[in-house]
């Protein structure tokens, strides 16, 4: 089963998206956007940048949990991962974004 982006609207009328792997697990989440068009642009940016290893920033949270950010060419964060148990799990998450994002469908759940 292929990955997909879910475009959603929050209770406070902001827009955001999540990238789900084929198994339904969320592997990347966006920030909140004021406009739907901006969130759609964010999805396109993830698709464009997902295959470039240099766009992934590996990090460790204060509690020691590894995670990653996907950045656009201008350095802006366009998506963040969940917190992982290990660096190996984080690296698998990055591989999953690389594999799923470029051809993922977009499911608009904002209506």
Labelled PLM ranges:
Residues 1-3, 103:
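Charged, low-complexity amphipathic helices and coil/IDR segments
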Residues 6-8, 14-22, 27-33, 42-46, ...:
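A structural feature that tracks compact, well-ordered secondary-structure segments
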Residues 98-111:
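Glycine-rich beta-strand-turn "strand-cap" elements at beta-sheet edges
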